[in-house]
Amino acid sequence: MPRLFGTDGVRGLANGETITADLALRLAQAAAHVLGQDARDAGRRPVAVVARDPRVSGEFIAAAVAAGLASSGVDVFDAGVIPTPATAYLIADFDADFGVMISASHNPAPDNGIKFFAAGGRKLADELEDRIEAQLSQPVLLPTGADVGRIRRFADAEDRYVLHLLGTLQHRLDGIHVVLDCAHGAAAGISPEVSTDAGARVTVIGNDPDGMNINDRVGSTHLDLLAEAVLGHGADVGIAYDGDADRCLAVDHTGAIIDGDQIMAVLALSMARRGLLVERTLVATVMSNLGLRIAMAENDITVLQTRVGDRYVLEAMNEGGYSLGGEQSGHLVIAEHATTGDGILTGIQLLGEMAATGRSLHELASVMTVYPQVMINVRGVDRERVSDDAELNAAVARAEAELGDTGRILMRASGTEPMIRVMVEAADQATAERHAQELAALVTERLAI
């Protein structure tokens, strides 16, 4: 039987095979048993924060989760619609024992998900997820009478988070005109309030969630509308979030996209200049652009590479005590202020660097040359043999020798389907495409099932 928890909680079509009200209630009861144990051992009632993004299905799923927790003796504080990183922050700020976020992040509106955070607002370790999943098949012993939990509204949840974000800024944002694309998601309302209170001139798009329009041709996965708005309004910069605002990407005043690698480069240099980049080390995944590593090396900054996925970035940061990490997709973790990726925090720190230096985002991002990157997904192949095929390995070695220091090759097996991802970076697009196509064809020839 496949594992219920994926790389980012439990996710699927709401009211489909996985994400149902019944599962939400039972999963919450199982989580209450596992994550509330320390509180019960200390002789007190566990406390949990529950929140959601604006998807229409979030209402019944959050209600089922709250019912499952309260029926298990957990006091629930319902924060309503707030970003995922706000939930993580509030768990720590409120000293809750754990929390639950109902969201499917950048997925379309019909999907939804259930994600748990441990005490301190930290993502769950695999071991805790496995214990929760195992608990689903165990008998449920529920309290009665005065021992059941209460469900209360977390009245000042949004205000606490807004004040936290404003407190992270070193400079006001006066004089900066920013277009914010809130993806009709959890950033709506909050992000414009933060940027306005910090002094920026704000134009907003994607700020009218109706429960079904989240991520619909807006947000960090659809940047065309943001680029048009930046150019049309003559703005200095644009920032786009995904549905739960745990990531952001940007657009400079020319309409050019500034991805997560470029944002990391800008913030790493800023933090290094201020003595805040621990061990002058940036944590990034193997998918980050070669240009990021080159730019950081030129500034005496080490790039520590991890597997793909923000959870692996977080693990490396926590193990090494590092202060900044992230992904090309725009998931950035600024450890001084957050325990998980926070798009609104990342965005205002980027604006803060513009304000502090008086430089445009176009100028700041120019520290890094983005190498052309070509990715080909080769399906229907035996992913287990990718590292053992001698002819394929020889072809990769020849291509790497030709690229030298001006490119790289990455072959990565999918963890969920018979597919190999072939990624090639080179100094020019044509070279990257040529090597990627040649290697993809060889993968098909050698590893076809």
Swiss-Prot record:
The modification Phosphoserine is found at residue 105. This is Phosphoglucosamine mutase. Its EC number is 5.4.2.10. It comes from Clavibacter sepedonicus. Keywords: Isomerase, Magnesium, Metal-binding, Phosphoprotein. PROSITE patterns: PGM_PMM. Its cofactor is Mg(2+). It is an enzyme of class 5 (isomerase). Mg(2+) binds at residues 105, 242, 244, 246. Binds 1 Mg(2+) ion per subunit. GO terms for biological process: carbohydrate metabolic process; peptidoglycan biosynthetic process; UDP-N-acetylglucosamine biosynthetic process. One of its GO terms (molecular function) is magnesium ion binding. Belongs to the phosphohexose mutase family. Disulfide bonds: none annotated. Activated by phosphorylation. It catalyses: alpha-D-glucosamine 1-phosphate = D-glucosamine 6-phosphate. Catalyzes the conversion of glucosamine-6-phosphate to glucosamine-1-phosphate. The active site is at residue 105. One of its GO terms (cellular component) is cytosol.
